[in-house]
């Protein structure tokens, strides 16, 4: 997993082969962030929420591009541990990994976000329950 641009550009993190989730490809990330660049002012240090964080690939890219805070929600214990480990290596205090269920977190969360990214790794019957 590689960071495309920003302060962590070029950093690599090896994902264990045992992971169910695969990182968002560089091609997909580049296209996603090319679109987002038209809507998000990275210099304004937005606050972001990464739901179903998986490998943390999007979390890393958001941090690298200048988000003042990124909260990452991941339910799988191994994936959460991996996300926490690379955040610890980076010593980035703007990253807040949370191990837990996305829907439980959202039902209790009162914080406002400038950007919310949701990429569930499976078909979600509750997708309509995600707030706008």
Question: Could you say what each language-model-derived stretch is?
Answer:
Residues 1-132:
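Class I S-adenosyl-L-methionine-dependent methyltransferase catalytic core
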């Amino acid at each position: 997993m590689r960071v495309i641009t920003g302060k962590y550009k070029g950093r690599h993190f090896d994902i264990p082969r045992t992971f169910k989730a695969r990182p968002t490809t560089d091609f997909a990330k580049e296209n996603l962030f090319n679109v987002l660049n038209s809507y998000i002012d990275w210099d304004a240090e937005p606050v972001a929420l990464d739901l179903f964080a998986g490998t943390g690939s999007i979390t890393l890219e958001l941090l690298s591009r200048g988000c003042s805070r990124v909260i990452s929600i991941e339910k799988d214990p191994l994936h959460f541990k991996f996300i926490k480990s690379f955040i610890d290596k980076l010593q980035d205090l703007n990253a807040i990994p949370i191990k837990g269920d996305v829907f439980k977190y959202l039902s209790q969360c009162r914080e406002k976000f400038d950007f919310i990214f949701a990429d569930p790794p499976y078909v979600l019957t509750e997708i309509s329950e995600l707030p706008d």
